[in-house]
């Protein structure tokens, strides 16, 4: 039986960038990896309502730089940057090194697989019909300019006795084409009937030229708390 490879892992180094950007020798590697995991777990739990898309961690010269991609930067930054400062202190305690936090806004959350899957899971937990939640997400993504989107849910759908899987797709989602810019994410909805898994694939178009093109196009709008306040005025 054919199995599907992880779309993001398959494209790493071709058109996708890593979420942890650092190099460590054998002695330090495990510690760095463990602290990265703890930082991500802490941020996802603390900023649960901030619509976090992804977290990039870099380690320049005995320090750590965390870039948070979010659809709601105001919640992360807080009043006069107070929340960012609290986060910085907490992460410094976890990692034991100086921390710099940057915030990057996700302009189109409808085209971000992580945010779409989280949106569907939150709807399922609020007892919205799964077909309605799927269809709404697909229509919103296509309206915002996606070339294609596929959403799959699996589990005890609608409280059925036997778990099953259903999916809905619009446009094209070429999983075998390595230059295809496909965003993929998975989330879990914890309902009274059990856990329902949600998978989302979003095809945004093809990237020609590999990582060089990605570096050029994907320069994030990284903002410190001062820059963010300045831009809002």
Swiss-Prot record:
Record's keyword terms, sorted: Ribonucleoprotein, Ribosomal protein, RNA-binding, rRNA-binding
Any one GO molecular function term: mRNA binding
Pfam families hit by this protein: KH_2, Ribosomal_S3_C
Keyword Disulfide bond listed: no
Cysteine disulfide partners in this protein: none
Domain KH type-2, residue spans: 39-107
GO-annotated cellular components: cytosolic small ribosomal subunit
GO terms of biological process kind: translation
Subunit structure: Part of the 30S ribosomal subunit. Forms a tight complex with proteins S10 and S14.
Family: Belongs to the universal ribosomal protein uS3 family.
Role: Binds the lower part of the 30S subunit head. Binds mRNA in the 70S ribosome, positioning it for translation.
Protein name per UniProt: Small ribosomal subunit protein uS3
Organism: Buchnera aphidicola subsp. Acyrthosiphon pisum (strain 5A)
Gene: rpsC
């Amino acid at each position: 039986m054919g199995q599907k490879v992880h779309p993001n892992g398959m494209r790493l180094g071709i058109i996708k960038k890593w979420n942890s950007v650092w190099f460590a020798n054998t002695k330090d590697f495990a510690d760095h990896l463990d602290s990265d995991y703890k930082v991500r777990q802490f941020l996802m739990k603390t900023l649960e309502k901030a619509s976090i898309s992804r977290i990039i961690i870099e380690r320049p010269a005995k320090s750590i730089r965390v870039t948070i991609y979010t659809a709601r930067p105001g919640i992360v930054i807080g009043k006069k940057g107070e929340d960012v400062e609290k986060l910085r202190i907490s992460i410094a305690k976890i990692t034991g090194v100086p921390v710099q936090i940057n915030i990057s806004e996700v302009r189109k959350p409808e085209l971000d697989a992580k945010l779409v899957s989280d949106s569907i899971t939150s709807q399922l937990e609020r007892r919205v019909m799964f077909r309605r939640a799927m269809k709404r997400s697909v229509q919103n993504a296509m309206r915002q300019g996606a070339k294609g989107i596929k959403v799959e849910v699996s589990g005890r759908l609608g409280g059925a006795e036997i778990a099953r899987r259903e999916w809905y797709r619009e446009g094209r989602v070429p999983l075998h084409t390595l230059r295809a810019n496909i965003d993929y994410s998975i989330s879990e909805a914890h309902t009274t009937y059990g856990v329902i898994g949600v998978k989302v694939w979003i095809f945004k178009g093809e990237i020609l030229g590999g990582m060089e093109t990605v570096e050029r196009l994907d320069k994030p709008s990284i903002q410190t708390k001062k820059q963010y306040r300045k831009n809002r005025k």
